[in-house]
């Protein structure tokens, strides 16, 4: 699918080496330390608290970082919170004359709050509520920020000791909303929609 160039790509990259190596197919598999990232319904089946942190240096001065915490909420629920950040630093700014100005950086942030509930002992549903923000430098003194909200919904069915079925819909209504009135004379509101997968 051609989702790479669309908004919110940092949420589709994968967080842990194991999940990336397995192609991101973790909807029905528990990703240790990042239990609710691939399917929020996992929070209702947790036995132990899950805490994880990840940092990755990527090419072209990009970086990806994440922190996650999830725990069961007895008797049949689970909660979690996670933060994912992606950004680029050391962007060389330029004046309109072409001369170098100061270095700038850009960054995308997602704060995810998770709740999951077991309906019966072997089925759970869960949701991630996302607060989204993108900070983008325009010039040395001007910066524009886009923000929005989004949701993930997941279902998990424990079909047996070694069999699990998972379904997840990622980035329902997720978007960045921008307003460029203060930066450009003909600016205005604009919305970048995330692809729903």
Which residues fall in each region the model found?
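N-terminal periplasmic accessory domains that precede
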Residues: 34-45
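Outer-membrane beta-barrel porins/channels
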Residues: 1-23, 27-29, 48-50, 56, ...
């Amino acid at each position: 699918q051609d989702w790479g160039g669309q908004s919110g790509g940092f949420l589709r990259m994968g967080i842990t080496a194991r999940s990336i190596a397995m192609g991101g197919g973790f909807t029905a598999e528990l990703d240790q330390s990042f239990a609710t990232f691939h399917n929020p319904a996992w929070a209702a089946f947790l036995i132990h608290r899950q805490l994880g942190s990840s940092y990755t240096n990527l090419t072209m001065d990009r970086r990806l970082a994440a922190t996650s915490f999830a725990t069961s909420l007895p008797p049949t629920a689970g909660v979690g919170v996670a933060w994912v950040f992606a950004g680029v630093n050391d962007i060389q700014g330029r004046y309109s004359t072409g001369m170098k100005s100061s270095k700038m950086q850009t960054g995308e942030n997602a704060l995810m709050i998770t709740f999951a509930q077991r309906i019966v002992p072997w089925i759970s549903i869960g949701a991630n509520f996302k607060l989204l923000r993108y900070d983008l430098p325009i010039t040395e003194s001007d910066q524009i920020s886009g923000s929005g909200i989004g949701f993930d919904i997941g279902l998990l069915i424990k079909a047996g000791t070694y069999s699990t079925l998972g379904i997840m819909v990622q980035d329902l209504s997720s978007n960045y909303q921008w307003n460029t009135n203060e930066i450009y004379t003909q600016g205005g509101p604009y919305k970048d929609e995330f692809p729903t997968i």
